[in-house]
Curated annotation (Swiss-Prot):
Keywords: Acyltransferase, Amino-acid biosynthesis, Diaminopimelate biosynthesis, Lysine biosynthesis, Repeat, Transferase. This is 2,3,4,5-tetrahydropyridine-2,6-dicarboxylate N-acetyltransferase. The gene is dapH. It comes from Listeria ivanovii. Disulfide bonds: none annotated. Catalyzes the transfer of an acetyl group from acetyl-CoA to tetrahydrodipicolinate. Its EC number is 2.3.1.89. It holds the Pfam family Hexapep. InterPro entries: DapH, DapH_N, Hexapep, Hexapep_transf_CS, Trans_hexapeptide_repeat, Trimer_LpxA-like_sf.
Amino acid sequence: MKQMDAHQIISFIQNSKKATPVKVYLKGDLEKITFPVDVKTFITGNAGTIFGEWAIVEPLLEANKANIEDYVIENDRRNSAIPLLDMKNINARIEPGAVIRDQVTIGDNAVIMMGASINIGAVIGDGTMIDMNVVLGGRATVGKNCHIGAGSVLAGVVEPPSAQPVIVEDNVVIGANVVVLEGVRIGEGAVVAAGAIVTKDVAPGTVVAGIPARELKKLDAKTASKTEIMQELRQL
């Protein structure tokens, strides 16, 4: 999938059909109800479950109050513009609780851990691990064989469309709770220490830390050993 630019994302959101899907558990004299074709029904006898848009389901419930003994509604979004990514055929390990929106690219053998939030237009390279509760903003790009530590935020940019996204090159290790501001590029093989706030580009093969992040040293054998990417964790 080719990465979307900001104008394409804006157009996608603008022109998408906004959705408020609901799931409703029903019981009552349901055989007397005529369900619209846009409502999916899974009903046996006097109980069942239906799926549909709230704009269709709400008047249906109101019109059939006499035939419905009770119901419970589940709803998790309102006028949502971007569906979640269909993950069934992605060649990666994606753990429960990750929230990944449509139009995201995920490379082979990538790992997305619990609680990660990945916005539209983001790109994750082959073999990269996105740890727990990481936020990848719109159009954020992470290269191959990286590790983005738990709780880190890679700022997204959809508006203004002229802004540049965060770019993380290959073989980068970012510690926990790091914030990378929009437009920053982190060079290949760099290491960003936990808790850093990265406000400017990071040179390849360097180690940075602090608020704001500053270069501490060139990557040496000791640091490389401590930040080694383990391919065993990426096997499917």
